[in-house]
Amino acid sequence: LSPSSAASDVYKRQILPEILIDLMEVRNMTIRKAEEKDIPRIIELLGQVLQIHADIRPDIFIPGTTKYTVEELTELLKNKEKPIYVAVNESDVCVGYAFCQLQKQPFSNNMLQFKSLFIDDLCVDQQARGQHIGESLFEHVKKEARKMHCYEVTLNVWSGNTSAEKFYEKMGMKTKERQMEYILDNL
């Protein structure tokens, strides 16, 4: 008997990538929770991400800065509801990260109660792109979200960051809602 088309699609989208990712991890990369020793590299990568955002929105982002300081990262590493996962190479050097936040949708009159794992930031070192590190990190986040009994994995992407949009769509993500703006010119 051959599997149904729907079951085959599920296999291709969910099970097969995890098998391939697991094989990759054994060969040359590991994904683990971030540790204090990773902070200097994470700061470097945060700078790369901020520069991408500053290039897209110079009216909002300040070039040459990072989202977090060393002290803030040290505190974040202690927060179990905001896990940071790092992809490290065979020399245990961080080549990518995923900052996550466990979010709980409380019950209300119009919405069911559920948990989400929000990807606050995902980055792969610009020198290491094209090696499927981003895919590995994303699959790892999905696996962790399942362990936490989350309903979904969510994130935000800045308009204009087309490479990120394409990557997340390739990973199976769909637009859930859009945040829109009207910039006032009175400043």
Predicted features along the sequence, with ranges:
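A short beta-loop-alpha structural element at the N-terminal edge
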Residues: T30-E44
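A short helix-loop-beta-strand connector motif used in the catalytic cores of GNAT acetyltransferases and
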Residues: E71-V86
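Conserved GNAT acetyl-CoA-binding A-motif
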Residues: R146-N156
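Single conserved hydrophobic/aromatic residue that forms the stacking wall/gate
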Residues: L1-Q14
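Conserved beta-strand in the GNAT
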Residues: V86, V93-Q101, C123
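Conserved beta-strand-loop-alpha-helix junction that forms the acyl-donor binding cleft
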Residues: T154-A164, E181-I183
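Conserved acetyl-CoA-binding loop-helix of GNAT-fold acetyltransferases
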Residues: V124, G130-K143, K170
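Conserved GNAT-fold acetyl-CoA-binding loop/helix
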Residues: L50-L73
